[in-house]
């Protein structure tokens, strides 16, 4: 397994990194620290040595990710799914949330975890696996 981390140039001049992982069987994937967005999943094409194909539906570049209002391929939160009428009660306290999909609150609101830059805390490489720990303090 091989890991490559590099800074990504982007029009917003944000400190975004990409993490690219390759194995010996010609599989690879790439994700960004911006929203934990999974950018590519490349698999070998049968009977075509050293050729791969990206099988992930997504944006072609970081600009598409930055401009998107979507959540797919990203870390979502603080909640996953929809909170009806953008409000809830907990321990007899009532909370009103931002209705980013009126009248509901979806996947963390106006600026969810998909729009945050995550910090790479640790990358652990082994012969047959990779572990990447990221964090975001909110």
Describe the residue ranges of each PLM region.
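Surface-exposed acidic/polar loop and edge beta-strand patches at domain peripheries
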Residues: 1-138
């Amino acid at each position: 397994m091989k890991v490559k981390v590099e800074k990504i140039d982007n029009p917003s001049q944000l400190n975004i990194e990409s993490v690219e992982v390759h194995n010996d069987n010609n599989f690879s994937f790439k994700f960004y620290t911006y929203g934990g967005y999974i950018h590519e999943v490349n698999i070998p094409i049968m009977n075509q040595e050293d050729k791969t194909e990206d099988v992930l539906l997504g944006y072609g570049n970081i600009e598409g990710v930055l401009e998107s209002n979507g959540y797919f391929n990203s870390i979502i939160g603080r909640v996953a799914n929809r909170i009806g009428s953008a409000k809830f009660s907990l321990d007899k306290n009532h909370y009103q949330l931002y209705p980013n999909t009126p009248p509901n609150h979806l996947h963390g609101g106006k600026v969810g975890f998909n729009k945050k830059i995550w910090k790479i805390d640790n990358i652990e490489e082994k012969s047959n696996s990779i572990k990447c720990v990221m964090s975001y303090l909110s």
